[in-house]
């Protein structure tokens, strides 16, 4: 049976979920060394045919992933360079860990990206095995503007696209064509070497071409698509001249397009997702069941406005208590994915997970035996030190006792400053991974 302390149960569920997507553990589970054989996700590679093993990568989880690869390969790595977010470094023996800015790229990211591109280019050979470590944040950290372009050129182009109303798929198509590494270009540099990518997914649906902008995956967009996007949004003449010149050269066939499905540059590439939101949610469900709750997965692909998603979850919790549908209490409703918060001109401090908890608190007001929890698996929710927050039927009343009006804080997107005085923030510290968000509703209907 569930304990009377819903927070204690939720804490155990959260810890189990985060442990299941630990970057080091994920790599070690996917990568096994048996003598001269390297087993990767069911495939066996004969290390005897490779003279050099080179490790490259980018993302928040890059350092623990690199440490794990070094431990598994035990002195066999020839060289390596991995770029991580500031403060996310860790000691390694052979692989060089470089830090750069995230989410806004900086010159250190450019230097790191070009350094990685140069290493891959220099080591590319039939008898080289490349291991590429990709995780959340990789797109902003793996910055290697194509020849003739500067970081400022790419930034200005992205700003114009965002202001014009272009969607993320259109923006990514442009980004890939302005990079030395994105959109399969890293794989092209590594050919004819063997390339294995170990990937921690931070995107809804685990789309390989989207994670870190798909440096080791075929790209379906073309130079023509890019030109059409810029023309359609009326910014062809506004983008920096070097960007327009590169597009024109691509259209004239003077610059190769990004690798497409079937391109020989991708023949020696294996892409393996070693950790994902679904894995975290599955482990959370298992832990909830051990604690006496009937788990139910709503979806791992939930997107949309945060407060609307919260109200849907709260409505399901109320339905469980009112009718026993879609399942009876005690139960645990779980979901994953990544929602969005639309900010107005007047906003405070918070993040999508804290906003979820606050919106849920308003819809659960006065309801006993329900706990709502939402957290970012990277340990960060918005520009704060919190990963998320928890809320229950008493949260609104407890806030009111301290002069905090929950609805006003929600309107101002100021959930951090609502939950902090209540001691209801979830503080995990940086987890050095990112598989999006985890949300759960524990429903018992019993007074704690």
What positions do the PLM features span?
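Active-site segments that bind and position negatively charged phosphate/pyrophosphate groups
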Residues: 278, 282, 286, 292-374
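Internal helix-turn-beta structural module
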Residues: 357-448
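Gly/Ser/Thr-rich active-site loops/lids in small-molecule metabolic enzymes
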Residues: 149-167, 219-234, 346-372
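N-terminal amphipathic/basic leader segments beginning at the initiator methionine
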Residues: 1-48, 64, 71, 225, ...
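Conserved phosphate- and dinucleotide-binding cores of soluble alpha/beta proteins
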Residues: 126, 130, 140-212, 220-227, ...
